[in-house]
UniProtKB/Swiss-Prot annotation:
Signal peptide start-end: 1-20
Key words, A-Z: Cell membrane, Disulfide bond, G-protein coupled receptor, Glycoprotein, Membrane, Receptor, Signal, Transducer, Transmembrane, Transmembrane helix
Name listed for the protein in its UniProt record: G-protein coupled receptor family C group 6 member A
A GO BP entry: positive regulation of insulin secretion involved in cellular response to glucose stimulus
Subcellular location: Cell membrane
Residues annotated as glycosylated: 332, 555
Classification via InterPro entries: ANF_lig-bd_rcpt (IPR001828), GPCR_3 (IPR000337), GPCR_3_9-Cys_dom (IPR011500), GPCR_3_9-Cys_sf (IPR038550), GPCR_3_C (IPR017978), GPCR_3_Ca_sens_rcpt-rel (IPR000068), GPCR_3_CS (IPR017979), Peripla_BP_I (IPR028082)
This protein's GO CC annotations: cell surface; plasma membrane
PROSITE patterns, alphabetized: G_PROTEIN_RECEP_F3_2 (PS00980), G_PROTEIN_RECEP_F3_4 (PS50259)
PTM text: N-glycosylated.
Gene this protein is translated from: Gprc6a
Amino acid sequence: MALSFVFITCFMILLDTSQSCHTPDDFVAITSPGHIMIGGLFAIHEKMLSSDDHPRQPQIQKCVGFEISVFLQTLAMIHSIEMINNSSLLSGVKLGYEIYDTCTEVTAAMAATLRFLSKFNCSRETVIFQCDYSSYVPRVKAIIGAGYSEISMAVSRMLNLQLMPQVSYESTAEILSDKIRFPSFLRTVPSDFYQTKAMAHLIRQSGWNWVGAITTDDDYGRLALNTFAIQAAENNVCIAFKEVLPAFLSDNTIEVRINQTLEKIIAEAQVNVIVVFLRKFHVFNLFNKAIERKISKIWIASDNWSTAAKIITIPNVKKLGKVVGFTFRRGNMSSFHSFLQTLHMYPSDNNKPLHEFAMLFSACKHIKDGDLSQCISNYSQATWTYDTTKTIETHLFKRNDFLWHYTEPGLIHSIQLAVLALGHAIRDLCQDRDCQKPNAFQPWELLAVLKNVTFTDGKNSFHFDAHGDLNTGYEVVLWKETNGLMTVTKMAEYDLQHDVFITTNQETKHEFRKLKQILSKCSKECIPGQMKKATGSQHSCCYECVNCPENHYSNETDMDHCLVCNNETHWAPVRSTMCFEKEVEYLDWDDSLALLLIALSLLGIAFVLAVGIIFTRNLKTPVVKSSGGLVVCYVMLACHALNFASTGFFIGEPQDFTCKTRQTLFGVSFTLCVSCILTKSLKILLAFSFDPTLKTFLKCLYRPVPIVLTCTGIQVVICTLWLVLAAPTVEENTSLPRVIILECEEGSALAFGTMLGYIAVLAFICFVFAFKGRKLPENYNEAKFLTFGMLIYFIAWITFIPVYATTFGKYLPAVEIIVILISNYGILCCTFFPKCYIILCKQKTNTKSVFLQMVYNYSAHSVDSLALSHVSLDSASHSTATTNPRPGNKTAACQNYKHLPVQVLAHTGMEKTMHASKTLHQKRSSSI
């Protein structure tokens, strides 16, 4: 581009220094004089003929391929200028125009621009080189055009030299918003930034993410594709392929590239949506070949061709699938429609395109409407000579309102806005100047006013933004077949500011919904409960769907990541679409195990009551008296009842009160029970003890009330400190995946262990004392049963420790309940059931005489054993005394002992036995 500019500059200097040249009138397409001249650049022909000269000479070649739609655009400019001239907007000032055909070539556009920049009213028509163009008066004051962005860029760089205003009606390349590189460029259409943003939004909203893109190899095509790629990525849309076609039809490779593009489309079977940034003649050739290959897709049309009648009228175009396009917002077209109906009365002597159209139309009048435009386009202008005196046939322009069907409303409205903007800017500039003079103002002055002008089209108000753009918005159009003909229908409007599509009625909303029925995805859609996992492809849209793991969920389609549930309060299974609240669990009253434990506790309480009744009714019997009396029995039975009742605090929803009560109630009541058993064990051991030393010690130790109060008091202190320093509290255990365990946190494991350990110490002492007195009379064998009871307690609680440590969940309290029940039942049964059995089933043995006889027999047996042990000791002493003087004579002593009379031993033992028996009998009788 820089080399081109140097070449142009040198070319302009040569023009200035060379001999004056002839005015190239044949290069001007349309002209009309005026006080203020406006230039126009339109691609009336689709291409320029290539030169066969070798070497090629610097000549402007003739153009072919008459474009009816662009011809209508030139008429729109003429009509808009005449509307201003016929209005009071510019009082006494007439706008003139010079319109040139660019032939879709930058070279022709630059040649026309050189003429625009040439000095006004100079016979030599040269561009004078100056360092300061502030007072330079060029041939025109402003330019409308060009249509294609690449041409506008080249022209704008030339116009920057004089800061001549250039207002484009169609160039949408985003780079043209850069006022540093293009300071004199303005446009009455939005930037491609908004169009590509709208396209990406439409694609995402329709549920597509795998699309193709086709563009031209020029500044417009490359910039549009890059901008769309950025917008697509932001909307999670991937471009499967990008095909680039030569920018000009004169390129010999264009047919090959079109075929390659179609082969790519066929190969990418999953791509059902294709975005097309092409010129009209590219799309025309592409679609004709696509119809031959029976390719049916959704085509996203850019504003370049979305309403082009030349393409809409392609035979069998409906076989291509759906075409959804973006076009500029339209305005009031009634005045222009009337202008077209009277076009035959318009003089054609200064309007070569009009005359050419009339001749081409006449030559193709035998062609039906569907092929008429193609016929006109295929005729070569090179075969025609213009006879401006020939009368234009009126009926040709009225044939089914032919020209009106080729009108592109969005572009026509943009041209009207461009002329209106210039008209209002000139009005503001000419308020204090005589604008009938050619040097009334310079182009750069008009540019300054134009940037800030506010104007109206009769309905809406407009002004250029800081980038020189007129953000009028877009219309979304859909090609639909109506009565056998393809028509363009408005589907929605796109609001640039809020990035939303605005539908006007239910029918258009239905059309939007129908688009979603077509799939264009690289991978199958991940349903809720799944997430996308990359497969190694460079495209993020290509993935595989994997299920969300446990405690994760996805509630939308095609989610990149599964969302995490709050593990403390919620959970989710594999492939979940939502989080579920964790169920709060605890050992409830209606639980089957809880019901069983409650029944056992109630049964235990019933047993306690039954024992209490039995003992109360048999209060004066020896069995009850030997048990310590009714007070001790009632205290123990009450403790057992409290132990059974304490299990109820382990069931049901945990509360602070129940958590604090259950352990302390059990601990204190069980300690009181064991303390009573301890006193009973001491009493039994004391009653049947024959060792004087042990008896003396036990008499000092045996203090029932202090023992019970002291032992129980220590446990009360332990529990009180526990409740004060680290009381049990309710805790939500959230470590399980699907439930919240509502449980009592004991507060202090040390305090809990101390409480249980203290009971164990007391139980062990009871066990020792009971074990010492286990060999009592058969009917008085309470110590043996107490030993069994303590063994049951130890076995239960030793088992409890590992089970409690390894059990988890709502049944953890049940473990302690079971242990409490086992130990409580064990002690209750071993302590009271044998006595109840004697009371109820062996009433004959529950008398004082039987008990006295039993005690007497046991005492006699015990004394006999004691006497025998004394005889043995005496014999041993005598033998020792005999042998001591002669240590070596031990055998003789033993032989002497053997010959002692048996009667002597028996007599000695009998005397001692009778004395001990009487004494022991008196002691046992007093206890009964």
